[in-house]
């Protein structure tokens, strides 16, 4: 490391703050599939393929969406500290966030980064009012990204729900899918605290049981009938589905979708709206294609599906300490 390339203590403190906010981004099974490199004028977000989900996400599409969410959090946190962040995605999938000092930058919904959570609870059935939907639709959308909202009580909503249930039938009938899911389950408080990642028992509202008991219960709960009973109740309690699409099925667009998704989630959080993923149809190419045809959005790639509504806050998933995520400094 050359002396003139070292990061000053004050800048490094700002960068560490940005990273703390970046890694609050959502990720599939809470794998947190990222590492970071710090340089005097930029931060790189790198995909960590050791935390990939080869069964449910074989093309790493959801992984790169998560990296895009992290990049958006980083840019918002940078603005909060008086830095302008400019994002670009390299062909190897590394996200480059160029940082420069700039006064008077808005940091939209910065306070919501810490409040945002994936809420898997049953919602209260209330509908989102039109003026709130208009606010959600007004967020900046990256080029090539589509956002489609479908209200409960419409045929489109019911069609999407049916594809979620069919997705459950396929995934829960796949032993490899269930094995991968169990790999990322964290069965009690001790287990979740040891790893600070994965799907904690707490986010599902489960009790803190001895691990052998929790593993037995989970092993006998992973079946399509049980999952569909849960999802029918949860979907019936929601107000809307939100479907996020890309026009090109490639990494740069997946990252752009993640940035747009994170803006939407933070705006939703600010409005008191809960969200949870219902991405089963998008994780099965045949179902995703059928959904695009059914909804009349052929030419777009359905990528992320969430349900929206109102609910009490849930438990927060843990995040790994950032010290272990920084792999290099310029």
Please place each PLM-identified region on the residue numbering.
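Acidic, surface-exposed loops and disordered segments
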Residues: 1-330
């Amino acid at each position: 490391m050359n002396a003139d390339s070292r990061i000053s203590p004050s800048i490094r403190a700002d960068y560490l703050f940005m990273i703390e906010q970046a890694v609050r981004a959502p990720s599939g099974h809470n794998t947190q599939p990222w590492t970071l490199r710090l340089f005097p004028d930029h931060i790189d977000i790198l995909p960590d393929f050791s935390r990939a989900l080869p069964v449910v996400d074989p093309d790493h599409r959801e992984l790169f969406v998560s990296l895009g969410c992290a990049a958006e959090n980083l840019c918002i946190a940078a603005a909060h500290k008086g830095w302008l962040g400019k994002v670009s995605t390299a062909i190897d999938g590394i996200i480059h966030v160029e940082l420069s000092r700039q006064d008077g930058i808005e940091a939209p919904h910065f306070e919501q980064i810490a409040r945002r959570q994936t809420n898997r609870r049953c919602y209260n059935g209330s509908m989102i009012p039109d003026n709130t939907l208009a606010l959600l639709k007004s967020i900046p959308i990256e080029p090539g990204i589509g956002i489609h909202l479908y209200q409960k009580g419409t045929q489109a909503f019911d069609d999407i729900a049916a594809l979620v249930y069919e997705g459950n039938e396929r995934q829960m009938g796949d032993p490899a899918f269930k094995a991968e899911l169990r790999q990322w389950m964290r069965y009690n408080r001790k287990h979740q605290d040891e790893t600070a990642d994965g799907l904690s028992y707490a986010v599902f509202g489960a009790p803190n049981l001895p691990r052998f008991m929790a593993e037995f219960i989970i092993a006998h709960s992973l079946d399509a009938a049980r999952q569909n009973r849960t999802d029918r109740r949860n979907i019936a309690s929601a107000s809307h589905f939100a479907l996020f699409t890309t026009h090109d099925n490639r990494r740069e667009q997946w990252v752009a979708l993640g940035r747009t998704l994170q803006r939407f989630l933070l705006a939703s959080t600010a409005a008191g709206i809960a969200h949870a993923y219902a991405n089963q149809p998008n994780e099965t190419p045949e179902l995703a294609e059928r959904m695009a045809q059914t909804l009349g959005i052929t030419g777009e790639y359905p990528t992320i599906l969430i349900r929206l509504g109102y609910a009490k806050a849930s438990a927060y998933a843990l995040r790994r300490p950032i010290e272990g995520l920084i792999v290099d400094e310029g």
